[in-house]
Amino acid sequence: MSVHDLCCIGYITQDKIVTTKNTIYMPGGTSFYFAHAIKHLDPNGFLLVTSLAHTEMNVVEDIRKEGIEVKALPSARSVCFENIYGENQNERTQRVTAKADPFTMEGLQDVNARIIHLGSLLADDFSLEGIKFLSGKGLLSVDGQTGRKREKL
C-alpha cells in the first residue's frame, strides 16, 4: 500500500467564462489549480484524485505530463460552471450547468496520504461518511467555497 505525503481530492471542472468582450472555455476547479501549484514545488509524493467525463481526460493527461500522479475516477459528466462577469470584474454570477458523479468510499479506498485536502466545490461533493472515512487515513483539510452567488440549472 503506497502512502503519499499529500493528496488533493476534487473535481477538475470545465468552465465557461463569459465577459463583456468574449467567451472562453477552460479547465478549472480547486484540484486543477492545486496540481499546477504543486508542479512548481516537488511533485514527488503528491497524488491528485479527480472525477470527470472521458471527454475531459486530455486535461488529466496534460497534468500527468507535468510529472503529477493522477487518479482519475470515471464519471458520466464533468462538473461545469458558467461564470458571467459584467463590467466590474470583481462581480460574477456563477451557474452550475453539469455535475459529476459524487466521490465514493469505494472509489477512494486505495487513497492513502499523510495529508488529504478536499477541494470541495459544491455542497454534495463529499458525503459525511466519506469525510469520516478519509479522516481515518490522514490529516484532513477542506477548502469550503461558500459565499458566492450561484444558480443551478
Regions found by a protein language model. Give the residues of each.
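Conserved N-terminal subdomain of the carbohydrate kinase-like
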Residues: V3-H4, Q14-Y25, H40-G119, D124, ...
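Conserved phosphate/ATP/ADP-binding segment of small-molecule kinases
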Residues: S135-K137, T146-L153
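Active-site metal-binding loops of divalent metal-dependent hydrolases
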Residues: Y11-I12, T30
